[in-house]
Swiss-Prot record:
Phylogenetic classification of the source organism: Eukaryota, Metazoa, Chordata, Craniata, Vertebrata
Gene (UniProt): IGHG3
Sequence repeats: 116-130, 131-145, 146-160
S-S bridge residues: 27-83, 191-251, 297-355
Name of this protein: Immunoglobulin heavy constant gamma 3
Post-translational modification: N-linked glycans at Asn-322 are noncore fucosylated and the vast majority are diantennary species with a bisecting GlcNAc. Among them the most dominant glycans are HexNAc5Hex4, HexNAc5Hex5, and HexNAc5Hex5Sia1.
GO cellular component term, pick one: blood microparticle
GO molecular function: antigen binding; immunoglobulin receptor binding
Keywords assigned by UniProt, alphabetized: Adaptive immunity, Cell membrane, Disulfide bond, Glycoprotein, Immunity, Immunoglobulin, Immunoglobulin domain, Membrane, Repeat, Secreted, Transmembrane, Transmembrane helix
Region feature (CH2): 161-270
Length: 446
């Protein structure tokens, strides 16, 4: 599919009277290609209570996703909530304001006026009696039929029950990448129906694999939500190889509140798989001054985006890590970063930390890269510390030298000044002594 910008639809609750004092606002982003698309609320100012679901590939080859934010119901009439969508591949930016709508149930619905009853009060005419054969008493006239009564008007058509704004919505989620890549785990495709009303709570699911109906799905008990609606989930267990081979899974949902069944289809992203490249990076020298340090795992060049990244040390899982979502690179592949935070003492003790990556394009679907404080890194850190110490000592020496130099210059200048002054004074005194007193000599001659 060629690059296509998304269509954005705001989703609002029925009314301000929601249970629990909170309300859910939604934003549906549909029909875009390729991934990724970013969704924020109020230009990123609103982050609490935001949940953005993973993108889903539709049968049309385009992606769609949704984002939900939970806000206080008291703020719906006073604050503005805007869904900001940014699709960089198509250079599309869309801002949609989510406004509270008045649901159908809050308005007055008038039944159509019943038709006037047809009048059937006049009986049909009595059939004509036969002519008498004699002058005797004629035979009685046949009894006329009873007139049909149409006085009772037909019942007024029943008014439709109020519907929840928008009706039930259906979302289809793929199995977790780790579940599809490990034989010991069970991959599942999940079909979620939300906004199911109390008036029509029954939901029917039908599942199809490559167009063939299957019957091994399990429907979980419905769960009541904070907005007084139900959430119903159906889970279909799939075979590892069926999913990896690109089989298509369809969930068909029926409910009385829907004008027609809703169908959602999902399958593994199509395209040639590309093997990820894995690189591990030690903590930076600047970070070694802190109590905790970060170990980084860069995974790049993989396709499709279904991937799982975990950390472990000495065979035991490490849980204090964060992994970014896969991001689209310029060559059409994906990349991500995973950061593990550990105590600096554990790193300096030489513990080995491993970044484990699972992807369908890898040999045995698995690879691992280890990282530890090697002797080379220890020597480098020691040399860096020694170099820092030498530089500190050198600066101290240079500072002392400059200070002494300036003092010596000042001392030399002062001594020279006094020497010149003394010599000048001596010359003046000597000159006065040598010059003869001609006045005395003239006086003596006279």
């Amino acid at each position: 599919a060629s690059t296509k910008g998304p269509s954005v639809f705001p989703l609002a609750p029925c009314s301000r009277s929601t249970s629990g004092g909170t309300a859910a606002l939604g934003c549906l982003v549909k029909d875009y290609f390729p991934e990724p698309v970013t969704v924020s609320w109020n230009s990123g100012a609103l982050t609490s209570g935001v949940h953005t679901f993973p993108a889903v590939l539709q049968s049309s080859g385009l992606y769609s996703l949704s984002s939900v934010v939970t806000v206080p119901s008291s703020s719906l009439g006073t604050q503005t909530y805007t869904c900001n969508v940014n699709h960089k591949p198509s250079n599309t930016k869309v801002d949609k304001r989510v406004e509270l709508k008045t649901p159908l149930g809050d308005t007055t619905h008038t039944c159509p006026r019943c038709p006037e009853p047809k009048s059937c009060d006049t009986p049909p005419p009595c059939p004509r009696c036969p002519e008498p054969k004699s002058c005797d008493t004629p035979p009685p006239c046949p009894r006329c039929p009873e007139p049909k009564s149409c006085d009772t008007p037909p019942p007024c058509p029943r008014c439709p029950a109020p519907e929840l704004l928008g009706g039930p919505s259906v979302f289809l989620f793929p199995p977790k990448p780790k579940d599809t890549l490990m034989i010991s785990r069970t991959p599942e495709v999940t079909c979620v129906v939300v906004d199911v009303s109390h008036e029509d709570p029954e939901v029917q699911f039908k599942w199809y694999v490559d167009g063939v109906e299957v019957h091994n799905a399990k429907t979980k008990p419905r769960e009541e939500q904070y907005n007084s609606t139900f959430r119903v989930v159906s889970v279909l267990t799939v075979l590892h190889q069926d999913w990896l081979n690109g089989k298509e899974y369809k969930c068909k949902v029926s409910n009385k509140a829907l004008p027609a069944p809703i169908e959602k289809t999902i399958s593994k992203t199509k395209g040639q798989p590309r093997e990820p490249q894995v690189y591990t990076l030690p903590p930076s020298r600047e970070e070694m001054t802190k109590n905790q340090v970060s170990l980084t795992c860069l995974v790049k060049g993989f396709y499709p985006s279904d991937i799982a990244v975990e950390w472990e040390s000495s065979g035991q899982p490490e849980n204090n890590y964060n992994t970014t979502p896969p991001m689209l690179d310029s060559d059409g592949s994906f990349f991500l970063y995973s950061k593990l935070t550990v105590d600096k003492s554990r790193w300096q003790q030489g513990n080995i930390f491993s970044c484990s990556v699972m992807h369908e394009a890898l040999h045995n679907r698995f690879t691992q890269k280890s990282l530890s404080l090697s002797p080379e890194l220890q020597l480098e850190e020691s040399c860096a510390e020694a170099q820092d110490g030498e530089l500190d000592g050198l600066w101290t020496t240079i500072t002392i030298f400059i200070t002494l130099f300036l003092l010596s210059v000042c001392y030399s200048a002062t001594v020279t000044f006094f020497k010149v002054k003394w010599i000048f004074s001596s010359v003046v005194d000597l000159k006065q002594t040598i010059i003869p007193d001609y006045r005395n000599m003239i006086g003596q001659g006279a």
